Regions:
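Alpha/beta-hydrolase active-site loop
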Residues: 122-143, 289-292, 410-431, 575-577
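Short beta-strand/loop motif that positions the catalytic acidic residue
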Residues: 235-237, 523-525
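Short amphipathic alpha-helix adjacent to the substrate-entry channel of hydrolases
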Residues: 91-109, 377-396
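C-terminal catalytic histidine-bearing segment of alpha/beta-hydrolase fold enzymes
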Residues: 249-312, 537-590
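Primarily recognizes the serine-hydrolase "nucleophile elbow" in alpha/beta-hydrolase
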Residues: 133-228, 421-507, 513-516
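Short beta-strand element of the alpha/beta-hydrolase
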Residues: 74-82, 360-368
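N-terminal cap/lid segment of alpha/beta-hydrolase-fold proteins
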Residues: 22-71, 312-357
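Conserved alpha/beta-hydrolase "acid-adjacent" motif
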Residues: 242-248, 530-536
């Protein structure tokens, strides 16, 4: 039925040049702009600054089509500027994003909607009307411009991120009365990417969040309907943005409740307009390379039709060529292991020194295994240590005691004892190895991610009695990397999350003290993981409350062990670069 509607031929002259490239297309028939207000214009700040600009000549909102890609991939991206609904100011980033997308085969078009905010109406009303009309016109032009009517993506910044979210969640709610047959065309997007979305929470519906978006009464705005046409999303936000990142986490949570694939990327210490420098390469941070994450999301969703076959991670990092010296040592002195139990394995450390050392930092890594087993040769450990050795970093791998202890001890007690002692051992030997005892990080996956949270948040808590002078050395760390941590929330304390970790009463378990030595963290989690990514999100939110800025990335459609087999060009394939970007940003690897 949709395709039949798209064949309707319109008599308006403004629709006659749809097949041309690079032209400007007015949104409305002359005299039919809904809720027209003479004080509003439709122009970018670049246009407004041009000599001879006349407001009265710029009242018609419009689409601006970019030159078509040389090889189309069958999808279209509609780009939406921010500006507080007061202007359209993001034209520079619109142009940069359009160039990147065009190079990848996307047909690109930008929307310039009416600003400033309308009088007597919600601040978003004019933009929403123009946005719904714009999506209809884009869909109408699909056949002639060479893309699929059901492959229309939306990307917007700030207020444009708010408008992107509106269009992505509320297509079944009309923003205006129909003016012609164009309005019979559906106005839903097929994928949405809100960048530092503004006005998402009730403590900041028209400006920055008055209570940081974290108050008990700060709720997600009810303007977002999350109807049956709600599309997959990737959300991006800076951790110190006054337009609170909690808006993005709440949108993400709602999408999870609806089982709609989604990603969220949160950047430590970044405010509104977090963009960095994409030319920094491997010296860059996560926010420098945010557009790469957008492209990876599109690839993971197969929006470009080019999702390839998964590749085994171990085959990609099969060599120890970057490793120099290797050393293995037990964690406990003979006969002095705390709470020793005969059914458990013997814990040990392995030092992996790089051939060419480029940093004095040390990364401790260990695997998961449900506290039933663990192995430093598994895919959760070996590829990462090889990757970091290639970067010039010293890595220490740990085998902790498993299976779970008996006799009433918690599932993690033995492993926590081993980790605290391991950190002390590494710190005690760092200076001798010409490494920095105050630049030590820990990293674990799954149950090892739970153990990482223990080590990162609870170093002031004693896991065991002192048996020697090593116990006098602090066991805090400077950073932590939690990869799909398990057992984080109360609805999944001993297994997968029964409620998906989504409800408010699915709280962080009491295992984690979040004491005063808690360190910054990086979280990476599959969106489709049964050990819910909401555990990572809620821990990130708790760290933010404490003023501890951290990075977080979730990966659409990816489950537990997302990295084991991943398609090139996706976030599950490049995930280890997030570790290096985090260390770059925090300067731990210098």
């Amino acid at each position: 039925m949709i395709r039949n509607k798209l064949t309707v031929i319109f008599g308006f002259a403004l629709f006659s040049a749809l097949t041309c490239q690079g032209e400007r297309l007015p949104l409305w028939p002359e005299g039919k702009i809904p809720n027209f207000q003479p004080q509003q214009i439709a122009a970018t700040t670049k246009e407004v600054r041009q000599p001879g600009f006349k407001r009265e000549e710029h009242t018609m909102p419009y689409l601006q089509w970019f030159d078509a890609p040389s090889e189309k991939n069958g999808a279209c991206m509609l780009l939406i500027s921010g500006g507080g609904y007061k202007n359209c100011c993001d034209w520079r980033w619109i142009e940069k994003v359009a160039k990147r997308f065009t190079d990848l085969g996307y047909v690109c078009v930008s929307l310039t909607y009416r600003t400033p905010r309308p009088e007597g109406l919600p601040i978003y009303q004019s933009g929403w009307q123009d946005g719904q009309r714009a999506v209809r016109l884009v869909r109408q032009s699909a056949k002639e411009r060479g893309f699929d009517t059901e492959k229309i993506g939306l990307l917007g910044f700030s207020a444009g991120g708010h408008l992107t979210t509106l269009l992505g969640t509320s297509a079944l709610t009309p923003a205006y009365e129909p003016v012609d047959k164009v309005d019979e065309i559906p106005c839903h997007g097929n994928l949405a990417i809100p960048i530092y979305v503004a006005y998402a929470l009730t403590d900041g519906l028209t400006g920055p969040n008055t209570r940081g978006g974290d108050a008990v009464d700060a709720k997600l705005s009810d303007v977002f309907k999350f109807d049956a046409k709600t599309c997959p999303m990737a959300l991006f936000h800076g951790g110190t943005d006054p337009y609170s990142p909690q808006g993005s986490t709440e949108i993400y949570r709602q999408l999870r409740k609806m089982k709609i694939p989604a990603e969220i990327h949160l950047f430590a210490d970044r405010g509104h307009g977090f963009m960095g420098d994409p030319n920094k390469g491997e010296k860059g941070t996560a926010y420098d390379h945010w557009l790469d994450r957008v492209c990876e999301f599109l690839r993971q969703m197969n929006f470009d039709g080019r999702l390839g076959k998964p590749v085994d991670l171990m085959t990609r990092y099969a060599s120890d060529d970057a490793r120099g010296e290797y050393r293995k040592e037990p964690i406990w002195p003979n006969g002095r292991m705390q709470d020793a139990q005969p059914h458990q394995c013997q814990p040990y450390l392995e030092w992996h020194f790089p051939k060419e050392r480029k940093t004095k930092a040390i990364q401790i890594i260990y695997s998961g295994g449900g506290y039933g087993n663990n192995n430093p040769e598994w895919f959760e450990v070996t590829p990462v240590r090889r990757y970091l050795n290639e970067k010039g970093m010293t890595v220490v791998t740990m085998k902790y005691r498993t299976p779970r202890p008996k006799g009433g001890l918690a599932k993690h007690t033995s492993a926590w004892q081993d980790l605290q002692r391991a950190i002390r051992m590494v710190r005690s030997q760092a200076t001798k190895e010409e490494l920095d005892p105050n630049r030590i990080g820990i990293m674990g996956s799954s149950a090892g991610g739970h153990l990482t949270l223990m080590g990162a948040t609870s170093s002031k808590q004693k896991s065991s009695w002192a048996i020697d002078d090593l116990h006098k050395i602090p066991c805090n760390v400077q950073w932590a990397v939690a990869i799909y941590p398990a057992y984080v929330l109360t609805d999944g304390e001993n297994g997968q999350n029964s409620q998906g970790g989504n409800p408010n009463d699915a709280r962080i378990v009491s295992d984690f003290a979040f004491d005063l030595d808690t360190c910054p963290m990086l979280f990476i989690h599959g969106d489709a993981d049964g050990y819910s990514p909401m555990g990572s999100i809620k821990c990130w939110e708790q760290l933010r409350r404490m003023g501890i800025q951290s990075d977080l990335h979730t990966l659409a459609k990816r489950g537990h062990c997302f990295q084991r087999n991943a398609s090139p060009g996706t976030g599950s394939y490049t995930w280890m670069d997030r570790i290096w970007e985090f260390l770059n940003h925090k300067k731990f690897n210098q």
